Amino acid sequence: MTDVRLTSLTKTYPGEAGAALDALTLDIPSGSLTALLGPSGCGKTTAMKMIAGLLSPSAGDVTFDGQSVLNDPPEARGAVMVFQNHLLFPHLSVADNVGFGLRMRGRPKAEVRDRVAEILGRVRLPDLGPRMPSELSGGQQQRVALARALVLRPKVLLLDEPLSNLDAHLRLEMR
């Protein structure tokens, strides 16, 4: 796990009045569960994208364990983001979607297969590996997206409304 610190994190866009995120300062201790709460448009997703390296801040800093990560590419940060709208590859099976990041990192096929099977079991989808995303419910697709993030064993896991498509029972189980 990793200590995350946001210092005066700000994001402005040219031609827009005000900041999308204005001087957010936050310490997130290693191993903790932290929720960013607020109304739509207040900058929660913007902050997470900057932590993950998917968006550059206009000002401020993001540090992991005391080291700035602003110049690190997203894949080198060890932060993974799960988006509300899944972003699954429609032409890949569930198993291939979950194992995609491992394959891109050059992991051996046997390791990819074993870790994908393990994580699909953890998100309660052990038999859906051969299926295509279009054959899944919204809640199942959300769990595949979560599995795709978890299989990488990230230092920082960022979840943008990850439980929104799950029924009440599954929501409790996935927590």
Task: Enumerate the predicted regions with their spans.
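The feature captures the beta-strand-to-loop junction immediately N-terminal to the Walker
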Residues: L37-P39
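ABC ATPase nucleotide-binding domain helices that frame the ATP-binding cleft
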Residues: T45-M48, V144
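Helix-to-loop junction immediately C-terminal to a conserved catalytic motif
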Residues: A52
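Conserved coupling/switch loops of ABC nucleotide-binding domains, chiefly the family-specific signature
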Residues: S58-D61, E111
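Conserved ABC transporter NBD signature motif
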Residues: G60-S68
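ABC ATPase nucleotide-binding domains
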Residues: G78-A79, L88-R175
